[in-house]
């Protein structure tokens, strides 16, 4: 009886020791496999980040394309409108390399000088209506920048008429302004002697005086009907 008890105790102790070894082995195994699980999660996170990056990049390219297409459509529409306003053009080929073709054009019945086109009206209207007429032709009233430009214009005018230009004094304070916002330069003006002479005359015409014989600028009432000169940039094809 005594030997049986001893055997049972020994067996129990051995089983306990064996169980302890298995438990320790299992814990060690879990510790070894834990880093392996964290490593497998990193590639997934990297793939997800790259996917989001390329998705955002694709969206950015799409938005940029849409904006570009809209602007291109607006420019094309503007060019088409201008071509419809001036259905007939008179063009001169520019000096360009052989592989390039470029034409500088003015609408039919307009005068060409340097980089601009000029239309000399035969109808009389107020200064404001004259500017509106120019705007309907995608132009504005004449802005004189050089003596050469003015001399060219004078050669195409009739001495018995006066012609509105794009210079005015809206407030009557002798603060002259060009319609295209070109700064008014006192040293580059071509007023007749003793002009401008009346603060109530707020618009400017080109007219010819016989004494002395010369063309020049004269301030006049803006409502009085006069002929006019329109100006626009040349159209390049």
UniProtKB/Swiss-Prot annotation:
Glycan-modified residues: 185
UniProt-annotated binding residues for Ca(2+) 2: 195, 197, 201, 218-219
Molecular-function GO term, any one: pattern recognition receptor activity
The entry's keywords: Adaptive immunity, Calcium, Cell membrane, Disulfide bond, Glycoprotein, Host-virus interaction, Immunity, Innate immunity, Lectin, Membrane, Metal-binding, Signal-anchor, Transmembrane, Transmembrane helix
Residue ranges, Extracellular side: 70-237
UniProt-listed GO biological process terms: adaptive immune response; antifungal innate immune response; antigen processing and presentation of exogenous peptide antigen via MHC class I; CD8-positive, alpha-beta T cell activation; cell adhesion; cell surface receptor signaling pathway; negative regulation of cytokine production; negative regulation of tumor necrosis factor production
Motif (ITIM motif): 5-10
Tissue: Expressed preferentially in hematopoietic tissues. Expressed in all circulating Ag-presenting cells such as dendritic cells, myeloid cells, monocytes, macrophages, B-cells and epidermal Langerhans cells (at protein level). Expressed in peripheral blood leukocytes, neutrophils, moderate quantities in spleen, lymph node, and bone marrow, and at very low levels in thymus.
Sequence positions that bind N-acetyl-D-glucosamine: 207-209
Sequence intervals crossing the membrane: 49-69
S-S pairs: 106-117, 134-230, 203-222
Pfam families: Lectin_C
Main localization, broad class: membrane
Domain (C-type lectin): residue spans on this chain: 113-231
Topology of the protein relative to the lipid bilayer: Single-pass type II membrane protein
Coiled-coil region: none
Outcome of swapping residue 6 to F: Decreases HIV-1 binding/entry in cells as well as virus replication
Signals that turn on the gene: TNF alpha, IL-1 alpha, and LPS, down-regulated expression at the surface of neutrophils (at protein level). Expression is decreased in dendritic cells by signals inducing their maturation (e.g. CD40 ligand, TLR9 ligands, LPS, and TNF alpha). Isoform 2: mRNA expression is up-regulated by agonists of neutrophils CSF2/GM-CSF, IL3/interleukin-3, IL4/interleukin-4 and IL13/interleukin-13.
Topological domain spans for side Cytoplasmic: 1-48
Recorded GO CC terms: external side of plasma membrane; plasma membrane
Quaternary structure and partners: May interact with PTPN6 via its ITIM motif.
Role according to the record: C-type lectin receptor that binds carbohydrates mannose and fucose but also weakly interacts with N-acetylglucosamine (GlcNAc) in a Ca(2+)-dependent manner. Involved in regulating immune reactivity. Once triggered by antigen, it is internalized by clathrin-dependent endocytosis and delivers its antigenic cargo into the antigen presentation pathway resulting in cross-priming of CD8(+) T cells. This cross-presentation and cross-priming are enhanced by TLR7 and TLR8 agonists with increased expansion of the CD8(+) T cells, high production of IFNG and TNF with reduced levels of IL4, IL5 and IL13. (Microbial infection) Involved in the interaction between HIV-1 virus and dendritic cells. Enhances HIV-1 binding/entry and virus infection. Requires ITIM motif-associated signal transduction pathway involving phosphatases PTPN6 and PTPN11, SYK, Src kinases and MAP kinases.
Record note on domains: Contains 1 copy of a cytoplasmic motif that is referred to as the immunoreceptor tyrosine-based inhibitor motif (ITIM). This motif is involved in modulation of cellular responses. The phosphorylated ITIM motif can bind the SH2 domain of several SH2-containing phosphatases. Involved in the interaction between HIV-1 virus and dendritic cells. Enhances HIV-1 binding/entry and virus infection. Requires ITIM motif-associated signal transduction pathway involving phosphatases PTPN6 and PTPN11, SYK, Src kinases and MAP kinases.
Protein name according to UniProt: C-type lectin domain family 4 member A
Organism: Homo sapiens
